Amino acid sequence: MRIAVCENNRATAQQLCEWIRQYCVLYQIPAAFQCFFSPSEFSSRKERYHIVFMAFGGVTGFAQTRQLREVDRECSIILVDDTQEFAVRCVRLHCTDFILRPVKFRHVVRSMRLALGGRV
């Protein structure tokens, strides 16, 4: 399983990746991770991902989410933002979940369960 974390802040991205890794280890889910620290870096990617945590925030994060959904209908997208404004928009793009900052481990667990179809 390929998982991408898109976050401008490196420390926040590392924490999010660590929580996702913990979840994958706990439930024995083989996964490869990649962090993207800018929207342009994510836009120029070549790989496809099973799960994307989109945490660029604001209009930029939402635009990246829309762009991703247009090219990949199967990807489980978890939108992370510090305002509830994008929660409704998230539904329109068929995102798997929405996390309101600050992100906690329990939020990652819920999102991963949803992304995996409740299997674990």
Summary of predicted features, one role per range:
Residues 9-34:
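Two-component/phosphorelay signaling modules centered on CheY-like receiver
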Residues 35-51:
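Acidic, metal-coordinating helix/loop segments flanking the phosphotransfer/catalytic sites
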Residues 53-54, 74-85:
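A short, hydrophobic beta-strand element within the central beta-sheet of small alpha/beta folds
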Residues 62-74:
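Short amphipathic alpha-helix used as the core "switch/output" element in two-component signaling
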Residues 103-112:
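C-terminal output helix
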Residues 113-120:
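The C-terminal output helix
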